[in-house]
Structure formats: C-alpha cells, structure tokens
C-alpha cells in the first residue's frame, strides 16, 4: 500500500514543515498553494486591559494570547485547504500578518500542498 491511498487522512501537523522538502520523503506531486486566513479584531475590553498592561511594561499577555489563537486558526484552515487539494504534506509553510485597519489584523498561513512518498529505508 502506498502513501497516496491514505493521502487525506495522513496530513497531520507533523507533516508540515518550513523546509522545502519533508525529511525522509520524496515529493511525488505538487498540488499548489494551501492557505488559511483569519481576520481578528481586538475587543474594547481587551484593548483596555492591554493598555493597562503597557503601563507596567513586559509581555502583553492579552495580545500574545490573541496572536497565538489567530496563528493556530490560520494553521488549521491551511491544513483543511491542503486536505481538500489531496495533500498528505505541506512544505515551505509560512505565516504573515498585516494590519488592515485600526485594531483589525489579518493572519495568513500558507505553504505548498504536496503528495509525498516515504523514502526507502526511512
């Protein structure tokens, strides 16, 4: 049985890499760009709380939490998009973010959806 017969269910976070290839595997087919986009805004309460934290310096935990959640959601959406394309791995994964308005931020996670086969002896 080859990796392609299980390609949809095999795509797990462990098969996502920022490298241009997946160690121990050969890229058999490139399926195109997979992406996940999340647009988040700060709440008034969150902005007020974060504003208070800036008075004392250090890590602004409210914003850190918001950023971590947005990145995870974008990653999960990218995985879902790659699965739709039939991928069993994603290579060259990247994050990017842009402020598109006052307090509104877009986070995108993207990479190349691929089908890979395990190298002999790997």
From Swiss-Prot:
Signal peptide: none
Pfam families: YbjQ_1 (PF01906)
Domain of life: Bacteria
InterPro entries: UPF0145_dom_sf, UPF0145_YbjQ-like
Entry similarity comment: Belongs to the UPF0145 family.
Name of the featured protein: UPF0145 protein Bamb_4477
Organism from which the protein derives: Burkholderia ambifaria (strain ATCC BAA-244 / DSM 16087 / CCUG 44356 / LMG 19182 / AMMD) (Burkholderia cepacia (strain AMMD))
Lineage, uppermost ranks: Bacteria, Pseudomonadati, Pseudomonadota, Betaproteobacteria, Burkholderiales
């Amino acid at each position: 049985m080859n990796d392609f017969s299980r390609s949809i269910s095999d795509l797990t976070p462990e098969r996502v890499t920022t490298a241009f290839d997946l160690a121990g595997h050969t890229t058999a087919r490139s399926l195109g760009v997979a992406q996940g986009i999340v647009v988040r805004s700060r709440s008034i309460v969150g902005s007020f709380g974060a504003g208070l934290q800036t008075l004392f310096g250090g890590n602004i935990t409210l914003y850190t939490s918001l950023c971590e959640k947005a990145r995870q959601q974008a990653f999960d959406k990218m995985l879902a998009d790659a699965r739709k394309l039939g991928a069993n791995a994603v290579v060259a994964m990247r994050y990017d973010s842009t402020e598109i308005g006052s307090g509104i931020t877009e986070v995108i996670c993207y990479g190349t959806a691929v089908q890979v086969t395990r190298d002999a002896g790997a």
